[in-house]
Structures are given as structure tokens and as C-alpha cells.
Swiss-Prot record:
GO terms for biological process: aldehyde metabolic process. It comes from Acanthopagrus schlegelii. This is Alpha-aminoadipic semialdehyde dehydrogenase. The gene is aldh7a1. Belongs to the aldehyde dehydrogenase family. Transmembrane segments: none annotated. GO terms for molecular function: aldehyde dehydrogenase (NAD+) activity; L-aminoadipate-semialdehyde dehydrogenase activity. Its EC number is 1.2.1.31.
Amino acid sequence: SGLLINQPKYSWLKELGL
């Protein structure tokens, strides 16, 4: 994970710690 490509919006938000 960690990519914005093909990732659900909540997925990369959790990666940011939000």
C-alpha cells in the first residue's frame, strides 16, 4: 500500500494516519 493508484480513498487516508 502507500500508493494513491487503485487505492480506496479511505485506504491512503489511513496511511497518513488520518
